[in-house]
Design a protein with these regions (language model features):
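Sec-dependent N-terminal signal peptides
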Residues: 5-14
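Sec/Tat signal peptide C-region and signal peptidase I cleavage site
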Residues: 16-20
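Active-site neighborhoods of enzymes that stabilize oxyanions during catalysis
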Residues: 21, 25-27, 34, 53, ...
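N-terminal carbohydrate-binding/catalytic regions of secreted carbohydrate-active enzymes
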Residues: 39, 43-92
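Structural recognition of the beta-strand scaffold that forms the well-ordered cores
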Residues: 42-45, 61-65, 99-104, 132-133, ...
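Helix-loop module immediately N-terminal to the HCX5R catalytic loop
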Residues: 71-101, 216-250
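Thiolate-centered catalytic microenvironments shared by cysteine-dependent enzyme domains
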Residues: 83-174, 197, 259-281
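C-terminal soluble interaction/assembly domains
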Residues: 237, 242-301
């Protein structure tokens, strides 16, 4: 149970910090409306600079995108930048060490949703847990008739300091060693998990032996106006079906780290805190030719 203890102990060091403004993991539009003018609140939009500039945004927000936080490693895996580089990027967004942070996505595509949840996990990884994701994103904000603006503020570098909680990440080699001892959740679509189909970027069909499936797409919706958004459940379907205790240690994987991080955010908001994200995920797992099952089912269906 060593890994479980590491996670809980590390997180408690951060959860015990006191903040003047405390952000819930899943932020309601009512909460954000009430606290919008608070000087200790920082708001980050995940979209692109053109959309942020010309299609309005939540007042006081700054903009970033998913690709700002990841790079292609030498083996072709997409992974987070090193801790200090991530911290510098956060400071450049004007984030201070004691800021309450709300992240939202525009929802022009599902990548923006994944980017928002990935950034949420990165804040946790860097030791800043006073952060939340706006439930239903920009779509929800417009539906609630929240304030919007077109002006962009001048950004002054913030004072953010990383206090890394690296136990919130699990590396590929460690995952292979410990996967039989913990609940391993794969966030890919059901047909990918079943070994029937795959993303083009994935070199192999199949799944990690013993893993369970909770597709992040289960919680994605598209509004008539074209915006995508995530509808957070009270309890994720898989965890409800398996009757998973909130204290149980859970390992999260996907094809890439953004799908893993999406489930991290959804699970965390539902009260599951003993979580570790596989950032390099199945891209690296399959490059290293580590064990899979259901690798030939796609051939049987042709």
């Amino acid at each position: 149970m060593k890994y479980r203890i590491i996670i809980i102990t590390a997180c408690l060091l951060v959860f015990n910090q006191s903040f003047a403004l405390s952000v819930p993991p899943s932020v309601s539009t009512q909460w954000l409306k009430k606290n919008l003018k608070n000087t200790e609140l920082a708001i980050i939009e995940v979209s692109d600079k053109v959309d942020f500039t010309f299609n309005n945004h939540i007042p006081g927000s700054v903009v970033t995108n998913k690709s700002d936080w990841r790079y292609e490693d030498s083996d072709g895996s997409l992974v987070r930048y090193p801790v200090e580089k991530l911290a510098e990027k956060i400071r450049r967004l004007g984030i201070n060490d004691n800021d309450a942070v709300v992240i939202y996505y525009k929802g022009n595509n599902t990548d923006e949703i994944l980017g928002a949840f990935y950034l949420y996990w990165l804040f946790h990884l860097l030791g800043h847990t006073n952060v939340g994701v706006l439930n239903e994103g920009w779509h929800g904000w417009l539906e609630a008739k929240g304030e919007i603006e077109s002006d962009s503020k001048t950004i002054q570098a913030g004072s953010f300091v990383a206090q890394p909680l690296l136990a919130l990440e699990v590396k590929t080699d460690e995952l292979n060693k410990i996967r039989n001892h913990y609940l391993l959740v794969d966030g890919r679509p059901a047909t990918h998990f079943q070994g029937l189909t795959k993303f083009e970027a994935n070199p192999r069909y199949g799944r990690i032996p013993g893993s369970f499936n909770q597709p992040w797409q289960d919680y994605i919706r598209k509004e008539k106006n074209g915006y995508w958004y995530a509808k957070a459940p009270k309890i994720p379907k898989l965890l409800a079906r398996l009757k998973v205790d909130p204290d149980r240690a859970i390992l999260l994987t996907c094809l890439g780290g953004t799908g893993s991080a999406f489930n991290y955010g959804i699970f965390y908001a539902a009260g599951y805190r003993n979580l570790r994200v596989d950032d390099a995920a199945l891209r690296r797992w399959n490059i290293r030719r580590l064990p899979l099952e259901n690798t030939n089912l796609n051939k049987l269906n042709k």
